[in-house]
Amino acid sequence: VALIANAGYEKTYAADNLGRLQIATFDPATHDALAKLLPPYVTVDPLLDLTPMAGDAMYADCIRTILQSDTVDALMISIVPHSILLHTTDDEIARTEGHLAERIVDLIHTYKKPTVVSVNVAFGAGAVYNRFGQILDSGGVPTFLTANRAMICLNAFVHYRLTRHQQYRDAWLT
């Protein structure tokens, strides 16, 4: 599994809840492609913290690059939508073609890898981000309010999928 976040604490919450999932190792092509996309203050890492300085395009380009990688089987995307560089409010979404929610839905359907999204909204501010979550939900993207919950659910889904696909029923019980 790999992770893309724009806040370090979300990265930590997700990492603390990996469960049986293992952190991916980027192949050289993925590492190099990300290095070209990222500013020098961001370290290329499978638990990628874009910082609040990432806009819609950088987020989407990193998601695409990671989903294209043969060494990544699943992805968790964590978004703290308060960043001024992201178009995440209802008003911004209405005015912006190619906003992040739309891009995420398209990318997930293109690459078809297990992916979950956490949209961490501070209490009292959630209403201005309703449309963002609605677009993800209506696009079939599993969406959660916290990174830890998203990672727990991704872990359960991947384990279920492997168990069902490989018919390891005994493994499910362990």
What is the predicted function of each stretch?
Residues 1-89:
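Short glycine-cluster motifs
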Residues 1-4, 9, 15-23, 92-174:
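Peripheral docking tails and interdomain loops at the edges
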